[in-house]
From Swiss-Prot:
Belongs to the DENR family. It comes from Meyerozyma guilliermondii (strain ATCC 6260 / CBS 566 / DSM 6381 / JCM 1539 / NBRC 10279 / NRRL Y-324). Keywords: Cytoplasm, Ribonucleoprotein, Ribosomal protein. InterPro entries: DENR/SUI1_TIF, DENR_C, DENR_eukaryotes, DENR_N, SUI1, SUI1_dom_sf. It is found in: Cytoplasm. One of its GO terms (cellular component) is ribonucleoprotein complex. This is Translation machinery-associated protein 22. Interacts with the 40S ribosomal subunit.
Amino acid sequence: MTEVEPKSVLYCGVCSFPPEFCEFGGSFKRCKEWLEQNDKELYEKLYSEDALANATSTLSIDKEQKIAKELEKKQAKEEAKQERELKKQLASKVTIKRIERNKRKHVIAISGLEVFDIDMKKLSKTFASKFATGASVTKNAEKKDEIIVQGDVSDEARAYIEKLLEEKGLNEVKVEQIDDKKKKKAAEAAEAAAAATGNKK
């Protein structure tokens, strides 16, 4: 029996649709730019002057102009929406907080990812697998999702998140690493108090 090789399907790095369907999404302009950079051959096949001429050859001039105008209006509206969302994303930041649980044991809390359309549960599973540790999604004090990862892997997590954002064209987003000093001092104070109580006995 002849083995049938699975067909390789390219998905857009911006909207995640196959490139043939990008025009129906809200980020068509960015999708076209992504395709031109990543698959020049398919870009020419879909968007060269010949391809566009063939696609509209059966339409009347009036109908063609009407469709073009409606599509342009829709795309302008969607692009304005995308522009607002992009500005919001670029103004946001991701925080990786390193928290000391007890001596030599740490966890990191990653927050601020919810505005970037990133699947938090999927990312926590990726971290658990990649760093061979525990990871879960919880709600922080602001009632927003954050990823808690066991172990001091803040540098590795930062590198991975920066790469993830870069793939989405969000290179300018700041990924900030901080130490939770309050928790650390509180833990030290608790240990000191426990030691003092023990000495009195």
